[in-house]
Amino acid sequence: MHVDIPAEQTAEASVRGGATLIITGVNHSAMKPRDLSIEEKRRLFDRLAGLLSNREEILFAYVYGSFLHGPFRDIDIGIFLQADSSGAAEPLRYEVVLEQELEDAMGVPIDVRVLNAAPLPFAFSVLQTGEVLVSRDEKARCDFVCRIYTHYHDFAYYRKRYRREALGLLR
């Protein structure tokens, strides 16, 4: 798949096997925010859930970000993949391809992030502020939620201490 994007909006990433993946993206912050009614958002939500439900590699997905709270420029989606899927092995490639497929189908900019190996603060934020879009495996979803919440709160002391130390508040 190829999409023509200005050079300043592209980046390269090495992937397994020495190949290079060209990551293209649109600066969504430059787009005008969409302000849809609750009913229009619900229709988009349901269409998106239907599209993701057909993908067996996706165990569960969350919508998070501005789409849930007001005007939005894109729809942010966090997905958790089966461990043996190619997307879990190459999350960056999977994100780019799925974003394009969903944008083509929905007509709305989509931002996809694979949660399997996402940084702890990011995963916690998605779970804390997001809404379940699809859940094909409730046990896997609940295990993930418990693991992220446990690790996040276990690490909170060290995160707070580090911040205080970085600001020079500890002696």
Regions found by a protein language model. Name each.
Residues 2, 8-60, 68-71, 82-171:
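Catalytic core of pol beta-like nucleotidyltransferases
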Residues 76-78:
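Short, well-ordered beta-strand segments
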